Amino acid sequence: MLLGSHVSMSGKKMLLGSAEEAASYGSTTFMIYTGAPQNTRRKPIEEMNIEAGQAFMKEHNLSNIVVHAPYIINLGNTIKTENFGFAVDFLRQEIERAQALGATQITLHPGAHVGAGPEAGIKQIVKGLNEVLWKEQIPQIALETMAGKGTEIGRTFDELAAIIDGVTLNDKLSVTLDTCHINDAGYNVKDDFDGVLVEFDKIIGLDRLKVIHVNDSKNPMGSHKDRHANIGFGTIGFEALNGVVHHEKLTALPKILETPYVGEDKKNKKAPYGFEIAMLKNQTFDPELLEKIQGQN
């Protein structure tokens, strides 16, 4: 089973440090940002410690890693077009970085229309992706399903399908499905995930689904909020998310946890991932999980 979490990539260790963190959680896969998600400053590829990282991954059965593009990249903005060229250039470089790291999927928030309307935003995203993608690239851009907060595009499968249909080299496009986001967008993950997959297959095609973000939600279905909760402690619940992780149609896909760190004060928050991964492997909900996470050294 390909199950892991978001891990950091920083310092001198870079990819090796990410792989070590993932292994410490009992992961078989992981997701990284190539630098801080809130900015676009990036180290050169030769400083990412790729050889040592990949050797460690091989030894510890870690594979199918995912890169997450920074969320400040907005291809959908038709209001402030001066940032468009930069976003296109950055994404092209991100594909090169992902390829060097050995990742075949780059999760990307499609963008926001910032008031111009979804149609204008979709058109602009299509234009951007047509400039970004090239025939020889190996990694796919995995457009993420969004919660529909503000003017986000990708709140429905139809919006993602419209982007995919508009892009010339759309064999380079795939989809990241986030359980919290689609719940908050109005899809019934809790009681009818099979129905959600049927709808996804009809509109986009299950063959495009390449990454799953496994998150519970702090908000009710259809709230358009996007606030992640720890597994089993939100409105989706453990049973449904365990069903997603162990779903027979999703066996080959990396499942990535992006659940919140646990703790009352910011300085002492603890990573939940080792505990949540173990719980999902055991397929039994632990109501005392949050206390156990907080109690770790």
From Swiss-Prot:
Binds 3 Zn(2+) ions. Its EC number is 3.1.21.2. Zn(2+) 1 binds at H68, H109, E144. Zn(2+) 2 binds at E144, D178, H213, E258. It comes from the Bacteria. Zn(2+) 3 binds at H181, D226, H228. It is an enzyme of class 3 (hydrolase). One of its GO terms (molecular function) is DNA binding. GO terms for biological process: base-excision repair. Keywords: DNA damage, DNA repair, Endonuclease, Hydrolase, Metal-binding, Nuclease, Zinc. It catalyses: Endonucleolytic cleavage to 5'-phosphooligonucleotide end-products. Its cofactor is Zn(2+). Endonuclease IV plays a role in DNA repair. It cleaves phosphodiester bonds at apurinic or apyrimidinic (AP) sites, generating a 3'-hydroxyl group and a 5'-terminal sugar phosphate. Belongs to the AP endonuclease 2 family. This is Probable endonuclease 4. The gene is nfo.
